[in-house]
Swiss-Prot record:
Assigned GO CC terms: extracellular region
Protein name in the entry: OMEGA-ectatommitoxin(02)-Rm1c
Domain EGF-like, first and last residues per copy: 43-80
GO molecular function annotation: toxin activity
Length: 93
């Protein structure tokens, strides 16, 4: 009985993880969201392979916080690293 309960819990957690990990992050594919604004002019090239956003919630006094939403297959603070661990990169034709 205990083993079947553990198996059910593990299966539930696995399904939940798969469902949650497949959901797009808010702002990743659609709207920027209420706490993200487009970066000001002059920051067009801030992100090497992605889109610059102003993260208002992370601002410090006198120091705005800029971040990047990386293009597909790129990772890193400014999207400068090609993610070769992503299997989709090799399947893209």
């Amino acid at each position: 009985m205990k083993d079947s309960y553990i198996s059910i819990v593990i299966a539930y957690l696995m399904v939940t993880f798969i469902l949650v990990s497949s959901m797009p992050i808010e702002g990743e594919k659609g709207e920027l969201g209420p706490h993200r604004l487009p970066c000001p002019p002059g920051y067009e090239n801030y992100c090497f392979n992605g889109k610059c956003v102003h993260v208002v919630a992370q601002d410090e006094p006198g120091k705005p916080c800029y971040s990047c939403i990386c293009d597909e297959f790129y990772i890193g603070e400014r999207c400068g690293t090609l993610d070769l661990t992503n299997p989709g990169y090799f399947l893209k034709g």
